[in-house]
C-alpha cells in the first residue's frame, strides 16, 4: 500500500471553543448601553422572537413580581437562547434552590432582590458559582452551552466566568455597602431597584429628588471604579435620567415591561381611531 503524502494527512481536530453566547454580557462589559425588556405576563415563546426582531438583546424574566411558573420560565429561557437573546432571570428569593435552578435552566444572569449585607452576598456566590468560588451542585448538559456533554472542569470554569450573578441594591444601607458587594469575588455587577430604594428613602416615586439621585450616583461610580457593570431598574420611562446615569458609567436598564408595552400600543390604536372619528364627525357637520 502506498504511504499517505504529508499534505493528505488529516490533522487532529481542535477542541471546540466553549463559551456562553450572551450578547448582554458582551455589551455591558464593553461599556455599551443595553436596554432590557421585562417579562411578567407574556408566557409564549414568541416573546423572545419578537424582542429580537425589535432589537432587544436581553430579556428580564421576573419571578419576583409575577405568577410565572418555573416550567414556563425554563421554556422562555430556551426560546431566548435559540434566537441569541440573553435570558436574565430575577429570582423570587435568595434561596439556593431558586438560584441554582434558574442557572441550571439556562439563564445567562441571575438577579437577586433584597440583598442587605455582605454576608448575604457571599452566600449568593456559594449558590451561583461552582467550586472553588461556591458550592453550586454540578450538572452536565447545560442548556446555556447547547446541552453539550463537556468535561466537568471545563464546563464549571466557563459557567463560573461567563454566567452572571447580580445582586440588587434597594435600600440606603445597601447603597453604602455597594463597594463591598462589588469587591466580593463572584459578584458580576449590581442592579439598582429604584422603586424600593425611593420607598426606603421615604420619597416613593420621587426620582428627581437629590437624595435618590445621589444614591444612584454612588453605586454607579462604585461599579465604574472596579469595572463591574451597573444596571438601573424602575425608571424605564425616564430617559432623561437614564441618559444621565449612562453618561456617568451605568450600562444597562430595565427599559419597558410587556404589560406597559402592550398597553401603550393598544392606547395608541384607540387614540388614532378617536382622532379619526372626531375628524369624520367634523366633516359630516360641515357637510350639512
Region roles according to the model:
Residues 1-288:
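Expand to "…catalyze enediolate/carbanion chemistry for C-C bond making/breaking, isomerization
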